[in-house]
């Protein structure tokens, strides 16, 4: 009953904002009839992106989160809708102070007074999934306490079940649905949002990222206090910084904006290629700038619920793809897509090369500083999808992160030339990958595994030799079978030739006899003779009959 009432509310909001107009035009007849009542509602004087954004906000935090996810999929969602969904606000009414305190005490097994020297009952922030308060530990360290909103898991499960039903219907009943894979999008959302409900997972991500950038001038990650962290409660160091979007404050302290923008790019490539562990939710709300050293500014990152990593093969192919693309070597881009397995092996390299050239050439006619690096990557993947490229979740995360970093960098410093930072980094990374030191590191890394398998080598060699011997014994039989097959093929060809000769002979006989054959038939009863039929026709008929008898 609750699910039915929720569905009614969703339909009412969809009708109010006429979201039926966002659906594909080629809907089945039943669906078209079902949506007819929507046309009774007036047309809102809003763009389609605004209508979708407001509908998400009216439907609550789960749909807000889903809209935010859609804003990270410009490969599937039109650009004007992506732009509007980026403005979705994830601010919701805080849950009760008493409830917050009860959850903390229940999870930590102690009263707030026993764990904290002071505790601010007013929330610092309240979002759809969690709420944050500030506190001070007994030893004087300032912390923030993040608590999962009570009962949110049931709300999420209910709304996702409804979204999945709609997605399956759209995918099964529309051509656009089959192309856009809405079920896959909702499943991706379900994985993402349920990961966000596990604060120990987020804490582990934060610890890893902090270790990767420990003592780095580029990025600071606050410390997690594991002794006070549980699945639904996270306690970590409180940071003080300037929101990265507060340009007035950054300029007031004379921050080197060019360096700040370039360091953002450097952080991205360091995470993706050197650490192979990247913060995949680097939107402006999760990034701050330290007050110290404005001439060499340092970023501060929070909220590590979503992270990504690539396989070593994907790292390698991505680096080579980016370098080839900016050299305008479209042939190599196409070859790398096939070689990496991103597109099926049956795809013609020449066709993919032509498609990539068509998309990229207009972009590269601009000055480098005006080129959107993320947009190039997006166009590349969008083109590859036309050639059956499977959706790679980690590459989608990376693309989304790059869009955020580049957009932020251009906001800080409009003349940012991302390629000037990326090119030497990628060249250096590829060179180091095959450096003797790197190869030695790989050898040491896999040596224990190889040593463990070494005792099996004699058996593997023996089995291999045994198989070769079996192949040797099989060879004469294969040769014999080949000869038999060839003989059968030759016999079949001879039979076919005879059939053709037979047909031609009879056809020739009939053709030669035709002028007098009719006369012979007319006098059949009286003469029982075909004396008027030309002799050549008898000869051809005899040849045909002989060939037919021989083939039997």
From Swiss-Prot:
UniProt-annotated binding residues for ATP: 124-132, 146
Keywords tagged on the record: ATP-binding, Cell inner membrane, Cell membrane, Kinase, Membrane, Nucleotide-binding, Transferase, Transmembrane, Transmembrane helix, Ubiquinone biosynthesis
Record's GO cellular component terms: plasma membrane
Domain (Protein kinase): residue spans on this chain: 118-498
First-listed, main subcellular location of the protein, grouped into a coarse class: membrane
Location relative to the cell: Cell inner membrane
InterPro entries linked to this entry: ABC1_dom, Kinase-like_dom_sf, UbiB, UbiB_bact, UbiB_kinase
Top-rank EC class of the record's enzyme: transferase
Active-site residue list: 281 (proton acceptor)
SUPFAM superfamilies in alphabetical order: Protein kinase-like (PK-like)
Pathway terms, separated by semicolons: Cofactor biosynthesis; ubiquinone biosynthesis [regulation]
UniProt record, GO biological process: regulation of ubiquinone biosynthetic process; ubiquinone biosynthetic process
The enzyme's E.C. designation: 2.7.-.-
Function field: Is probably a protein kinase regulator of UbiI activity which is involved in aerobic coenzyme Q (ubiquinone) biosynthesis.
Family that this chain belongs to: Belongs to the ABC1 family. UbiB subfamily.
UniProt name for this protein: Probable protein kinase UbiB
């Amino acid at each position: 009953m609750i699910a039915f009432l929720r569905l009614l509310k969703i339909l009412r909001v969809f009708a109010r904002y006429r979201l039926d107009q966002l659906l594909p035009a080629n809907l089945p007849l039943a669906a078209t009839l079902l949506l007819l009542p929507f046309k009774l509602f007036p047309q809102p004087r809003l763009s389609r992106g605004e209508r979708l954004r407001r509908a998400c906000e009216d439907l609550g935090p789960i749909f807000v989160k889903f809209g935010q996810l859609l804003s990270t999929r410009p490969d599937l969602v039109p650009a004007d809708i992506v732009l509007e969904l980026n403005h979705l606000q994830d601010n919701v009414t805080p849950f009760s102070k008493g409830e917050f305190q009860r959850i903390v005490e229940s999870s930590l097994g102690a009263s707030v007074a026993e764990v904290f020297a002071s505790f601010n009952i007013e929330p610092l922030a309240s979002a759809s999934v969690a709420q944050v308060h500030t506190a001070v530990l007994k030893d004087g360290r300032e912390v923030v306490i993040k608590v999962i909103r009570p009962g949110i898991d049931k709300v999420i499960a209910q709304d996702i079940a409804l979204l999945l039903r709609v997605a399956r219907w759209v995918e099964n009943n529309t051509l656009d649905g089959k192309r856009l894979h809405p079920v896959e999008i909702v499943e991706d959302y379900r994985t993402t949002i349920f990961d966000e409900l596990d604060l120990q997972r987020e804490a582990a991500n934060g610890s890893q990222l902090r270790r990767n950038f420990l003592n780095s001038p580029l990025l600071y990650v606050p410390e997690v206090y594991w002794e006070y962290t549980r699945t639904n409660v996270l306690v970590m160091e409180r940071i003080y910084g300037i929101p990265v979007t507060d340009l007035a404050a950054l300029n007031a302290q004379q921050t080197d904006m060019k360096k700040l923008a370039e360091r953002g790019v450097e952080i991205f490539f360091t995470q993706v290629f050197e650490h192979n562990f990247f913060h995949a939710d680097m939107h402006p709300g999760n990034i701050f700038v330290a007050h110290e050293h404005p001439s060499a500014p340092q970023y501060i990152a929070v909220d590590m619920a979503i992270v990504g990593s690539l396989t070593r093969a994907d790292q390698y192919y991505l680096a080579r793809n980016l370098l080839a693309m900016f050299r305008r070597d479209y042939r190599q881009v196409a070859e790398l897509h096939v070689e990496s397995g991103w597109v099926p092996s049956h795809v013609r390299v020449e066709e993919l090369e032509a498609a990539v050239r068509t998309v990229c050439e207009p972009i590269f006619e601009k000055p480098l500083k005006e080129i959107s690096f993320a947009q190039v990557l997006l166009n590349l993947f969008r083109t590859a999808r036309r050639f059956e490229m499977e959706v790679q979740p980690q590459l989608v995360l990376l693309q989304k992160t790059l869009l955020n970093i580049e957009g932020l960098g251009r906001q800080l410093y409009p003349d940012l030339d991302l390629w000037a930072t990326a090119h030497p980094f990628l060249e250096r990374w590829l060179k180091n990958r095959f450096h003797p030191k790197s190869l030695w590191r790989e050898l040491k890394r896999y040596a224990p595994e190889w040593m463990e398998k070494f005792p099996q080598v004699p058996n593997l060699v023996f089995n291999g030799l045994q198989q070769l011997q079996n192949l040797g014994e099989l060879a004469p039989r294969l040769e014999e079978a080949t000869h038999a097959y060839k003989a059968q093929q030759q016999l079949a060809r001879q039979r076919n030739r005879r059939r053709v000769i037979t047909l031609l002979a009879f056809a020739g006989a009939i053709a030669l006899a035709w002028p007098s054959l009719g006369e012979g038939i007319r006098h059949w009863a009286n003469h029982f003779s075909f004396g008027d039929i030309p002799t050549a026709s008898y000869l051809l008929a005899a040849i045909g009959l002989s060939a037919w008898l021989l083939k039997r």
